Swiss-Prot record:
The gene is leuB. NCBIfam families: leuB (TIGR00169). Substrate binds at residues 94, 104, 132, 217. It holds the Pfam family Iso_dh. Disulfide bonds: none annotated. Binds 1 Mg(2+) or Mn(2+) ion per subunit. It is an enzyme of class 1 (oxidoreductase). NAD(+) binds at residues 76-87, 275-287. This is 3-isopropylmalate dehydrogenase. Signal peptide: none annotated.
């Protein structure tokens, strides 16, 4: 079998971190004996510059045919038209592929807790996953309008939309430490009242999982004061967007956090959670670990290569533990150095 992978380098540092990761994929495929082919497509701001839109039909159709999609990063201050922004391409891609699940793990690597802005004793041993609903909620709700006197956004969820994301979260929790935290604002939001009701109903199907509920403001506090208490967190789109960015700083850098977005079937999208960082683009100083860890998720979930994923992750964790990092993590290596060291480790 030959896996079909679509590569979307995007904008800013996206091309340099994705292209380096693809060089690692070539080494890994030879070592673990599997075949793949890559289709490169412009996406986001780069696509706007070339084609006048952030996501062309050609690119979308290629993504629909793919086994996996690897995305570098998109966006930047260059693209200011509110009706034609790079981010709109990503929203359209998620909606078109029905990528309703977003998985964002946060892990504090052994021996690297000193990198966190929080006290070491608070973060050491943190290993949590945020499961974010990705295609509904206030980012997609209708009606919406804006003028100089009034603005309206609609936060809408159906029972079916809540059920499907909650089932994913329960199954993930059951495969880990058996604890699920559901985040809402049930005391004031109608959508959260339905959310909590559905979570409680679905919980009856997963007796092996312990469930607790937290208001989103309380959860944001507990993520900082005691992140080790969490196993799996499930939340709606807006809350998940905010909480996952908050959680990403716990290990010490946005550059350490991967993510995967998927549906019940079809291709999965893998990307680091950081932005395109146009201020450092092309300077060979970007931290590529988030992109490489996203590749590891792709190896495990879409390419059926769990051993390769484990090896890649362990090499990264070892590098971080021994201070072989870029400047944002206190190290002295550049982007190319990271890929060269990992290439040597994988070839060993």
């Amino acid at each position: 079998m030959t896996y079909n992978i679509v590569a979307l380098p995007g904008d800013g540092i996206g091309p340099e971190i994705l292209n380096g990761s693809l060089s690692l994929l070539e080494i890994i495929s030879n070592k673990y004996n599997f075949n793949y082919q890559i289709e490169h497509h412009e996406f986001g701001g780069a696509s706007i510059d070339t084609f006048g839109e952030p996501l062309t039909e050609k690119t979308l159709n290629a993504c629909k045919r793919a086994d996996a999609i690897l995305l570098g990063a998109i966006g930047g201050p260059k693209w200011t038209d509110p009706n034609n922004r790079p981010e709109q391409g990503l929203l359209k891609l998620r909606k078109s592929l029905n990528l309703f699940v977003n998985i964002r793990p946060t892990t504090v690597v052994k021996g690297a807790s000193s990198l966190s802005p929080l006290k070491e004793e608070r973060v050491e041993g943190t290993d949590l996953v945020i499961v974010r609903e990705l295609t509904s909620g206030i980012y997609f709700g209708e009606p919406r309008h804006f003028n100089n006197h009034e603005a309206l956004d609609s936060l809408t969820y159906t029972r079916e939309e809540i059920e499907r994301i909650v089932h994913v979260a329960f199954k993930l929790a059951a495969s880990r430490r058996g604890k699920l935290t559901s985040v809402d604002k049930e005391n004031v939001l109608a959508s959260s009242k339905l959310w909590r009701k559905v979570v409680n109903e679905v919980s009856q199907l997963y007796p092996e999982v312990t469930v607790n509920h937290l208001f989103v403001d309380a959860c944001s506090m507990h993520l900082i004061t005691n992140p080790k208490q969490f196993d799996v967190i499930v939340c709606e789109n807006l809350f998940g967007d905010i909480l996952s960015d908050e959680a990403s700083v716990i290990p010490g850098s946005l550059g350490l956090s991967p993510s995967a977005s998927f549906s019940n079937d079809g291709p999965r999208l893998y990307e680091p959670i950081h932005g395109s960082a146009p201020d450092i683009a092309g300077k060979n100083v970007a931290n590529p670990f988030g992109m490489i860890l996203s590749l590891a998720m792709c190896l495990r979930e879409s390419l059926n290569q769990p051993d390769a994923a484990d090896e890649l992750e362990q090499h990264i964790y070892s590098m971080i533990e021994h201070g072989q990092t870029t400047a944002d993590l206190g190290g002295k290596l550049n982007t190319t150095d990271i890929f060269e060291i990992l290439s040597q480790k994988l070839n060993h």
